[in-house]
A protein has these predicted regions:
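Nuclease-adjacent, charged terminal/linker segments that flank catalytic cores
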Residues: 1-74
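Conserved catalytic cores of phosphodiester-cleaving nucleases, focusing on short active-site segments
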Residues: 117-130
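A short mid-domain helix/strand-loop element embedded in enzyme catalytic domains
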Residues: 48-58, 89-96, 120-123
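Catalytic cores of nucleic-acid endonucleases
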Residues: 128-175
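Extracellular-facing segments of soluble proteins and assemblies that are Gly/Ser/Thr-biased and enriched
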Residues: 62-101
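Active-site metal-binding core of divalent-cation-utilizing nuclease and nuclease-like domains
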Residues: 89-119
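Short, well-structured alpha-helical interface segments that form or flank functional binding sites
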Residues: 70, 74, 78, 112, ...
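Charged, structured surface patches that assemble and position nucleic-acid processing machinery
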Residues: 171-196
């Protein structure tokens, strides 16, 4: 299975659904506030009613106001579904994070991002990144931090997919090749290995 293609197809479906939801909720407080703020940002060159009608009748305008699928944990949910894994909590007493000593901690301040899954004997972080740039490099740094700190005392994995990781996954594997506590893979690799 090519997980990148699967995610992109599901994101398209989510965009269509998100536009439908936006249009159904056009008169809700949240949508009205978005419209009002947009009109105010453009200092009255359009009215709230014009924007409202645009959302209802113009796909391009609606697409600018609907929720963005990348902010809805779609890839994480799809990875869980495809791999048959249960998502770990991102906060609270069952959250898994690592401090500078490689110890499991529950608080976010000064510690790694939380583990997303348990993959066999590994605490795993999962990322899907489809573009290049600064925000994506921040995600890469989060993954490296998770692997470095977590591997001090535990087995940790990075499940990384998308165009960005197609480029950086081999570099990451090279960086951690001598660390027996680190696994770097992708949903695509895992599903292909299951078939064999």
């Amino acid at each position: 299975m090519n997980f990148t293609n699967y995610v992109e197809e599901k994101k398209k479906e989510a965009r269509i659904k998100n536009i439908e939801i936006l249009r159904k909720e056009i008169d809700s407080f949240d949508v009205r506030e978005k419209i009002k703020n947009h009109v105010m940002a453009f200092e009255g060159i359009m009215s709230e009613e014009e924007v409202r009608e645009g959302i209802l009748n113009n796909l391009i305008i609606a697409s600018k106001f609907c929720k963005e699928p990348s902010k809805q944990n779609i890839s994480e949910n799809l990875a869980a579904e495809v791999l048959g894994l249960k998502k770990l909590p991102t906060s609270g007493k069952n959250c898994i994070r690592f401090n500078d000593k490689g110890e499991i901690v529950r608080t976010s301040s000064g510690n790694t991002k939380s583990a997303d899954f348990i993959l066999g004997e590994y605490y795993a972080t999962q990322k899907y990144t489809d573009g290049m740039g600064g925000a994506q490099d921040n995600q890469r740094n989060d993954v490296i931090d998770f692997l470095k700190r977590g591997s001090i005392n535990y087995k940790v994995a990075a499940i990384v997919d998308g165009a960005y990781w197609d480029k950086y996954r081999p570099i990451l594997k090279k960086e951690f090749e001598n660390n027996p506590n680190v696994l770097i893979t992708s949903v695509t690799e895992i599903t292909e290995n299951i078939k064999e």
